[in-house]
UniProtKB/Swiss-Prot annotation:
Gene Ontology MF terms: rRNA (pseudouridine-N3-)-methyltransferase activity
Localization per Swiss-Prot or TrEMBL: Cytoplasm
NCBIfam families xref list: PRK00103.2-4
Name of the protein: Ribosomal RNA large subunit methyltransferase H
Binding sites annotated in the UniProt record for S-adenosyl-L-methionine: 73, 105, 124-129
Lineage: Bacteria, Pseudomonadati, Bacteroidota, Bacteroidia, Bacteroidales
Keyword Endoplasmic reticulum set for record: no
Species whose genome carries this gene: Phocaeicola vulgatus (strain ATCC 8482 / DSM 1447 / JCM 5826 / CCUG 4940 / NBRC 14291 / NCTC 11154)
Keywords, sorted A to Z: Cytoplasm, Methyltransferase, rRNA processing, S-adenosyl-L-methionine, Transferase
PANTHER family for the chain: METHYLTRANSFERASE (PTHR33603), RIBOSOMAL RNA LARGE SUBUNIT METHYLTRANSFERASE H (PTHR33603:SF1)
Coiled-coil residue spans: none
SUPFAM superfamilies: alpha/beta knot
Catalysed reaction equations from the record: pseudouridine(1915) in 23S rRNA + S-adenosyl-L-methionine = N(3)-methylpseudouridine(1915) in 23S rRNA + S-adenosyl-L-homocysteine + H(+)
EC number: 2.1.1.177
Amino acid sequence: MKFTLLVVGRTVEKHYITAINDYVERTKHFISFDMEVIPELKNTKNLSMEQQKEKEGELILKALLPGDVVVLLDEHGKEFRSVEFANWIERKMHTVNKRLVFIIGGPYGFAPKIYDAAQEKISLSKMTFSHQMIRLIFVEQLYRAMTILNNGPYHHE
């Protein structure tokens, strides 16, 4: 099984890039994990928010493979405590055969067709974060989940 984080647009803040890369590398000690970047849309001045979401949605769908289990990181998704998230991940590790794909959308969220393609939605907080920052929060939580499952010293209850 492989874990993939699919994001729209590259991370631009240098301090986020450094921290994200650190957690991605740490996480790879436990699982097969990668981050795929869908290029940001160009020339969006004349596009409505809905049009941008639709165009991003087309690119997201092209990046998905048959058999992928798709989980959206969405403000309306299910919330977990860190230990609950670790247990959820463990269940997925026993039931998903191919890729477990977590998707972070662009600044306006997801097109309806992406919601239709998803099997689940999870939320990392009731608060709103930039789509750049949530990448760091997610990879940290995935790493934390791996240390919980492997009895590592990182997480404290």
